[in-house]
Amino acid sequence: YILDLRDFPDSPYKDKFVKDFNIILNDPEISVVVEVIGGIKPSYDFVKSSLLAGKSVVTSNKELVAKKGAELLKIAHEKGVNFFFEASVGGGIPIIRPLHQCLSANRIDEIAGILNGTTNFILTKMIRDNMAFDVALKTAQELGYAERNPSADVDGIDACRKICILASLSFGKHVYPDNIHTEGITKITPEDVA
């Protein structure tokens, strides 16, 4: 099933679209729910309800995992189901599973890397092409690297959520976005990166 409030009368899958989440939640044949809504509300309620109903959940929702991941992982463990969120960091580059499983016996002292492709593109343009921030951002938007509303990227929110997820898995204690000083790149000038 696909939960969507819109109608798709011409779709060959129109009988799979539902407007009531309980249809999905109460169907014993559904064992995995994929959340693609984003944000916290109503995603959190749907994901939590799915886990409590004994259904595994797959999501790429960074905000949900960063803010509610510890609770949702605990519920999944208690219910004997999976809560998968590999695509929430690195667009599916395998980092979550290795941190959670393969590297769990290792002591991790530091996490370093490029956490946001949009800001990396913008900063690279500023450094290599001496572009002003606004011009580099507009270029990123024109090429499809930046959203029309790029605030989550350029204000550091996206990177903050990702580092919370990675730090929580690496250091064994949930790290919340509110506890991380977050500063974006909007005030950086070409002179700053020269």
PLM regions: where:
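General beta-strand structural signal in soluble alpha/beta enzymes
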Residues: F17-V18, E35, V58-S60, F83-A87, ...
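A generic structural signal for short
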Residues: V34-V36, S60-N61, T124-K125, A152, ...
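Rossmann-fold NAD(P)-binding glycine/threonine-rich loop
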Residues: I37-A53, S60-C102
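Substrate-binding/catalytic subdomain of NAD(P)-dependent oxidoreductase enzymes
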Residues: V135-A194
